[in-house]
Amino acid sequence: MIIKPNFRRKARACALQMLYSWEISQNNIKDSAIEFLKEKNKKNIDIIYFYELIIGITYNCRSIDDLMKPYLSRSLKELGQIEKAILRISFYELYKRKDIPYKVSINEGIELAKLFGSEDSHKFINGVLDKAALKIKR
């Protein structure tokens, strides 16, 4: 089955919202996801990818954060929760999903920042991911 790119984009946006909620509440991510998806129109979301992101990121959160640290201009504690969640999604894709071109991961991170972040957060996300991509490039 071929997954449409916009289904993946929606999965990333939903994952971002779940990761943001999880970071603040520390609730069980799987239980929260079930409740979250009850309220969403799941028809146009890549549900499998959504679950892969939230489970993969929450289980590997410390290692993902460690991968990000060398590319950040400030500490993780100083990052906004939205920016942190976006970077976690992007770094997860860069390191764990070799089938996704790095340019796609970067672009999707920037688009999430434009949609959910503060006014200039897309510039920050772009800078961090560009630096990381130079090292990671596949």
Curated annotation (Swiss-Prot):
Disulfide pairs? Answer: none
Q: Which UniProt keywords apply?
A: RNA-binding, Transcription, Transcription antitermination, Transcription regulation
Q: Name one GO cellular component term.
A: cytosol
Q: Which Pfam families match?
A: NusB (PF01029)
Q: Does the record's keyword annotation contain RNA-binding?
A: yes
Alphabetical GO biological process terms: DNA-templated transcription termination; transcription antitermination
Tell me yes or no: is Hydrolase among this UniProt entry's keywords.
Answer: no
Single GO term (MF) = RNA binding
* Function (record text): Involved in transcription antitermination. Required for transcription of ribosomal RNA (rRNA) genes. Binds specifically to the boxA antiterminator sequence of the ribosomal RNA (rrn) operons.
Family (UniProt): Belongs to the NusB family.
UniProt-recorded name of the protein: Transcription antitermination protein NusB
Kindly list the organism's lineage: Bacteria, Pseudomonadati, Pseudomonadota, Gammaproteobacteria, Enterobacterales
